[in-house]
Amino acid sequence: MKAMPWNWTCLLSHLLVVGMGSSTLLPRQPPQLSQKPSFVTFRGEPAEGFNHLVVDERTGHIYLGAVNRIYKLSSDLKVLVTHQTGPDEDNPKCYPPRIVQTCNEPLASTNNVNKMLLIDYKENRLIACGSLYQGICKLLRLEDLFKLGEPFHKKEHYLSGVNESGSVFGVIVSYSNFDDKLFIATAVDGKPEYFPTISSRKLTKNSEADGMFAYVFHDEFVASMIKIPSDTFTVIPDFDIYYVYGFSSGNFVYFLTLQPEMVSPPGSTTKEQVYTSKLVRLCKEDTAFNSYVEVPIGCERNGVEYRLLQAAYLSKAGAVLGRTLGVRPDDDLLFTVFSKGQKRKMKSLDESALCIFILKQINDRIKDRLQSCYRGEGTLDLAWLKVKDIPCSSALLTIDDNFCGLDMNAPLGVSEMVRGIPVFTEDRDRMTSVIAYVYKNHSLAFVGTKSGKLKKIRVDGPKGNALQYETVQVVDSGPVLRDMAFSKDHEQLYIMSERQLTRVPVESCGQYRSCGECLGSGDPHCGWCVLHNTCTRKERCERSREPRRFASEMKQCVRLTVHPNNISVSQYNVLLVLETYNVPELSAGVNCTFEDLSEMDGLVIGNQIQCYSPAAKEVPRIITENGDHHVVQLQLKSKETGMTFASTSFVFYNCSVHNSCLSCVESPYRCHWCKYRHVCTHDPNTCSFQEGRVKLPEDCPQLLRVDKILVPVEVIKPITLKAKNLPQPQSGQRGYECILNIQGIEQRVPALRFNSSSVQCQNTSYSYEGMEINNLPVELTVVWNGHFNIDNPAQNKVYLYKCGAMRESCGLCLKADPDFECGWCQSPGQCTLRQHCPAHESRWLELSGANSKCTNPRITEIIPVTGPREGGTKVTIRGENLGLEFRDIASHVKVAGVECSPLVDGYIPAEQIVCEMGEAKPSQHAGFVEICVAVCRPEFMARSSQLYYFMTLTLADLKPNRGPMSGGTQVTITGTNLNAGSNVVVMFGSQPCLFHRRSPSYIICNTTSSEEVLDMKVTVQVDRARIRQDLVFQYVEDPTIVRIEPEWSIVSGNTPIAVWGTHLDLIQNPQIRAKHGGKEHINICEVLNATEMTCQAPALALGPDHQSDLTERPEEFGFILDNVQSLLILNKTNFTYYPNPVFEAFSPSGILELKPGTPIILKGKNLIPPVAGGNVKLNYTVLVGEKPCTVTVSDVQLLCESPNLIGRHKVMARVGGMEYSPGMVYIAPDSPLSLPAIVSIAVAGGLLIIFIVAVLIAYKRKSRESDLTLKRLQMQMDNLESRVALECKEAFAELQTDIHELTSDLDGAGIPFLDYRTYTMRVLFPGIEDHPVLRDLEVPGYRQERVEKGLKLFAQLINNKVFLLSFIRTLESQRSFSMRDRGNVASLIMTVLQSKLEYATDVLKQLLADLIDKNLESKNHPKLLLRRTESVAEKMLTNWFTFLLYKFLKECAGEPLFSLFCAIKQQMEKGPIDAITGEARYSLSEDKLIRQQIEYKTLVLSCVSPDNVNSPEVPVKILNCDTITQVKEKILDAIFKNVPCSHRPKAADMDLEWRQGSGARMILQDEDITTKIENDWKRLNTVAHYQVPDGSVVALVSKQVTAYNAVNNSTVSRTSASKYENMIRYTGSPDSLRSRTPMITPDLESGVKLWHLVKNHEHGDQKEGDRGSKMVSEIYLTRLLATKGTLQKFVDDLFETIFSTAHRGSALPLAIKYMFDFLDEQADKHGIHDPHVRHTWKSNCLPLRFWVNMIKNPQFVFDIHKNSITDACLSVVAQTFMDSCSTSEHRLGKDSPSNKLLYAKDIPSYKNWVERYYSDIGKMPAISDQDMNAYLAEQSRMHMNEFNTMSALSEIFSYVGKYSEEILGPLDHDDQCGKQKLAYKLEQVITLMSLDS
């Protein structure tokens, strides 16, 4: 159904409402209103998104701007009125919109996005601006949203066609007696000609007035607006200014913006667009926008830059924050939210910061900038508005705080960023909005976040830090939008997301349950209402003004102490006294409660309250089995409020739970031990005897610590124990016993108490099971009277032991602990005690006995059994009786007949010997191991049963044979006998390969890192044997990761990720990693080839308390590629984890019943990740039973086409690393069709056949129309083809004829070389005409003598090498010493040292050597050396060549350079050149090529010379399409052919006079009253416009202003003088350092645009006929080839001259050879032998540093004028020159830039010239220092007096003044400087130069 136009919809709605008698418009279905626990939420229509929000400060009503609707809501978010604004038929390309005039573009139903919503309080109306119809606005009555007006018929009514809600901001400025103003700032979406980016408009009282939204001021020249120039879009095609916030304060209006940087910041290597945030300021009363100033803003914390503005809000400082910041409480503060970095992406970084700016400080910074600019310092610095820097103009005037600018020095930019004060940062949940206010002197900020949370922040928190005191989840999904608003009473906050509007209280005091929590929360709204025991605002607490009723500080909280604070559970009704603090007056009474145990009245006496402990009947509930005490809360309850208002802990303790004396008396409570009753009690009077009471631990009966108690098994022995305070059993009590718990069996032994300090367990034998334990610790307990334990605090144990257990050999027996007294009984051959060995039958050996050596040593094992013949193998020998000391075996070991030296470290007495093999003889092959213990007698000798073999090891191969430089490759080396020996070392060259494992046929090792790409020889060392084979391992450059896709996964991981990079095939076990929450998660990857691999995203392990709907970003994300560290963390990716899909169960029963063929629907959420950019899907697999089904996915459901099954089957969904079963599905079988169903099917089939026949008839008719259309298109294609052929034919003909003509034209032209001084000044100080070094130093007379004396002394210091080097190094180390300063100092030093070039060269060499050292130390690539001009040394090098190559330029290289310049100029002028765009028919630059067929003729005019009327007429070739200015310039070139440019008259100063017959004369001009204007386009006058015929006579006459053209001239001069100074050619001799595009900018005020040959590319309003004449624009690229061919000879000639060692009779300048030799010496010194590096150094040093500068800027050498098209062509030649010097290979394709493709075939031959040139120079004999010094002295002498040395020294000294302390520091501390007293001398200079002296 076609959508109904919105105006008809409104009309019908209105009629319905009137019919129902209602007075308000209501939506058809009331939007949902939902109530959260404490939040009220409003949700609109499902298809609507909310855009803007504003609250009426007078009524509290809310106005909500949404897509297609405006709502008026009550303060509790109930809908009062709605007003529909869309959708409607529109097309963004319709300008003016279709409601004004018919639009040819196709129309479609278009939503109306609300872009601006403002309340005009003065006129009681709402201004609502949308995106429809190029951004028109409605004015609605606040009461009922009745439309008061909707102006749309003028272009001022179209604000902007941008379809984004956050792109427009408006500020209303109110006046009491005049109409208000509306300042509007908007993005323009690439249409700067239609919409100003910032403007001020009229707000008329009458909403339907004609002047509504008209510019406040608008005349022919000036208007209250600023447009973005079209030139800005040529630099950055998608440039726009995004306005984030706006406000008015004082006399100014401010806007905060986000806009692309015109110039990338230093160090930026990426092509990604960099953005900057700026504050824009305008005077409220400024109608011409001369007060426009913009300042960059940002903030930084802990080294992190936050530069992307997200939101802002203006508030006051408040008293507390004001004191911290040093401002008044009512001063304006700007609260801002920035995100990290400067790159604005769809996926902005989550790191963000809340920063504050003091508005007064920003204004002070602007005032400083205005003052400096009006002193003539710096440039206007507004790159987007003034593409070329315009210098500030000086003017004597006073600039105060309210200065509003003049028509000079405006608009103005501030280059230095104003840094805000960062008060809070958030790393994970990006902040997106901010609002702030002051509450009771505290400054509070409320911040919305990306995940829908609200952060409440106290900016003036404790210790000067911001305090985030609460976080609230407000929005269900999505971020909080920028617009937030307070309710009328500031007690509620309205928070908006795209789908909901929520009301949130500014405070939630009620959530805090205690005074400490309440006052410790940091929320200044909250205090403690004491007797109500609640946290609330003060005004909500009853009688809060009375003393101590309301606590607002922690120290005011109620505190209690109770005496006593504990009692025994056996005590009842004890009087307790409570001391109270901070308690209010309690006249109504108070109760004491012990939790729920008991409650009684309290007696209030002053600040004391008396209560009684619970009665006897209530105490049993307190006694517990756990522990000896129970804590209850003793609470005070107010009888006035019935609320508990204070409490303290009270302890009931129970002594009777203790069953030992020590635990009893060491209890913290009043417990006593009754020694004779063996009980613990709180009442000592219950003990039987007075002497039996124990209170101190030292009085307890207890065993004392004894040494180890050793008891051999089966030996009868008593155990004596030391003790103290042992009680004497009383009558009727039993005696003492010892209890030993042996392997779980209790053994009781009678004990005898000798006295109170000794007890003995009687004689008994003990035993335990098993021979695998040689000693067993046993618990020992002493008891009396049957069960009264004696405390054993030392934990004494008895150790039972068996000598024979685990000591089967003599050696092991004698190794036993000597305290065991074990020995070896030889006859039975076992380990026993002496008494168990029969003395008459056997010998008993003990360790301490004489000759106690064990006989019969035995070897059981040797490891290894093979080894290399060279020795060094560590052999491990294991066995029995292998000696008891190392000396026993130290020299008695042989292996296979070879001495093996035992090692002390490996020796284990009696059990193991480790020895190192000596070298074997060739005749030795194998043998046994033989040892002697102490002496080599048979009974002390042993021989192994195993043989030890000597092996020869060989290597065969290694795989893989290449790996990354970082190492980590697992390499397998194959060979024979590789398991021999004990120690293996594998080396790849000098790099170890870490041994992993081996077998007889292979060794596996892991490579370590290498610092360079090299082939390494493989060496294996086994013990002392080195094995070599011709095996080579190749270290290759590390893999790189170029791109991964997608950059997201779900939390459960296993999402497939494609990875592209280089050298990926080197990696054996690639893995992907993500670190989150401190834990690393890894998954596998599979390499496909060298450039591709696939990975499975790692899963994240999130905790159970994690919110499942949150997006996660890992702290680290990267790849584990063997040992490549650089890819462990990928900095350039923002890998994101989205929530896992969540499925719902089919039903509570888990069974879904379906018919066959019915799709199965699985409902859930997060089924499609919310990835920016949209179209992404997860790979779902759904199984029904075992069969998969076809799946269709949407946001909230999976639709599964059920397979051909019947019956009950389980459904399983799998995605990523998770699977889920929503339940079972039951598919019932089909029933057979009934008769009615069959009839229905037959009827439907018949209807279908009829329909198909009708479609076929329609198709036949349509195809006939298509054939006719095809024929028409064929004819048009034929016409186009013929035009293309003609163009190609013309280009070929031009190529053949132009070369001859050009060569003949250039013959004999004089070369206007600049003199040496002018030439050097243009290179050293570009753009500065009258530099101080060209004139005498100007000093007031009274200071002249001292200054000259000081400068002479300073000159001596400059001529001191130690000082000069220290001076330069110190300056370069200063952060504020800019690149411009470095170049300036280098040039000034060279001018001072012009007369001492030998010394200058020596200093330069030293600085270059230092630069090379620094470059290599910082690990930069050597090729980067001298690439840029970032140091004094590099600029000095440029200047050095400038001085020394002047002669070579004049005698040799200047001629081909001038010829090339003239050739380009003449060739360009042979064809049309567009005076507006600078494009030409003939060009080398694609950017400056006219891509259209321009019809033109060549005319020859006869020109009368302006200097001599009687001289012969000069024939001049011109084109009939030339503008009058172009004709004048060609005539001047012809007349003054050999005259330098600076000596010619200017075309602007001359008029062109056409002299017709009969003395008639006519002045021709670019613009006059005959100029044609069509559809806002004004075409410049051409020769054809005036119909000047071939052969006409013209004359150049001096400029005259006549009545005829006065109006026109004044127009041009007024425009030029005000807004467009930067676009007029200035008359200074050096034309420009950059190319200038000739432009005459469209007249912004009148809307008229100028054109010459082609209309500007940005304008889309060319007629169809214009388009038809264009053809395919790329066809005209053949003209580039034609031009290139014409100029080829001149390019070749120049390149050949520069790259020849001897040419045109001139020898190679000595400077070149000398400097190249110096670079070679430095390369040798640092071991750099890579020829590419040396080649690059030389290229960076001379061709790219000097020659490219000369080629691009021939005006540095010649007195010429360079126009923009010539500049563009020279840039192409210079780029070719640079490419020729490069060593890298240029890979070109069809998408490569045309200038690269143009010379692609020539560059290889040019590269050969360069290489030959460098090679020839290298072969030339070296220049001695004497010869070079003589040459330099001669150069110094020739140009000695070119510069004023005193002036140059004075300029250098200005840097001493700026950095005096920093320069003096190193001079004081350096020994060499100290010896020469350089610091003292410099201080003398400073004294002499100071103004005070």
UniProtKB/Swiss-Prot annotation:
- Residues in the signal sequence: 1-23
**PTM sites of type N6-acetyllysine:** 1349
**What does UniProt list as this organism's lineage?**
Eukaryota, Metazoa, Chordata, Craniata, Vertebrata
The annotated phenotype of a deletion mutant is: No visible phenotype. Mice exhibit defasciculation of the facial branchiomotor nerve and of the ophthalmic branch of the trigeminus, with variable severity. In mice lacking both Plxna3 and Plxna4, migrating neurons do not show the normal response to Sema3A and Sema3F and do not migrate away from these semaphorins (in vitro).
Q: How does it sit in the membrane?
A: Single-pass type I membrane protein
Q: Which family does it belong to?
A: Belongs to the plexin family.
- Please tell me whether the keyword Membrane is annotated for this protein: yes
Q: What positions belong to coiled-coil segments?
A: none
Positions in the Cytoplasmic compartment: 1258-1893
| Swiss-Prot/TrEMBL GO biological process terms | anterior commissure morphogenesis; axon guidance; branchiomotor neuron axon guidance; chemorepulsion of branchiomotor axon; cranial nerve morphogenesis; embryonic heart tube development; facial nerve morphogenesis; facial nerve structural organization
Gene3D superfamilies, per database record = GTPase Activation - p120gap, domain 1, Immunoglobulins, Phosphatidylinositol 3-kinase Catalytic Subunit, Chain A, domain 1, YVTN repeat-like/Quinoprotein amine dehydrogenase
List the GO cellular component terms: cerebellar climbing fiber to Purkinje cell synapse; plasma membrane
Principal subcellular localisation of the protein: membrane
- This protein's encoding gene: Plxna4
Q: Which residues are glycosylated?
A: 654, 1006, 1131, 1179
GO MF terms, alphabetically ordered: semaphorin receptor activity
Q: How does it assemble?
A: Interacts with NRP1 and NRP2.
Q: Per its UniProt entry, which superkingdom is the organism in?
A: Eukaryota
Q: What does this protein do?
A: Coreceptor for SEMA3A. Necessary for signaling by class 3 semaphorins and subsequent remodeling of the cytoskeleton. Plays a role in axon guidance in the developing nervous system. Class 3 semaphorins bind to a complex composed of a neuropilin and a plexin. The plexin modulates the affinity of the complex for specific semaphorins, and its cytoplasmic domain is required for the activation of down-stream signaling events in the cytoplasm.
Task: State the protein's name.
Answer: Plexin-A4
Extracellular side residue ranges read: 24-1236
Keyword entries, A-Z? Acetylation, Cell membrane, Disulfide bond, Glycoprotein, Membrane, Receptor, Repeat, Signal, Transmembrane, Transmembrane helix
